[in-house]
Regions:
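Concave beta-strand-loop units of leucine-rich repeat
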Residues: 17-24, 33-45, 53-61
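N-terminal capping/linker segments that flank leucine-rich repeat
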Residues: 1-34
Length: 61
């Protein structure tokens, strides 16, 4: 699964993106208002530019 500008809204709740363990291989874009990013247990090899205000990043396998 690829997370793009077109479908990222499906994973956003408030200021959090949660896409843990859903087979994500690529995240194209992270909006500037995001404070928490949870993307563990996927097949990511890199992340896009992270927002300056990001507080929490959980991205492990």
């Amino acid at each position: 699964m690829r997370i793009t500008k077109d479908n990222i809204h499906e994973f956003i709740e408030g200021t959090t993106i949660n896409c843990n363990n859903i087979g994500v291989i690529h995240i194209e874009y992270i909006p500037d208002h995001i404070k928490n990013l949870y993307c563990s247990d996927n097949k990511l090899t890199s992340l896009p530019k992270l927002p300056d205000g990001l507080i929490r990043l959980n991205c492990y396998s």
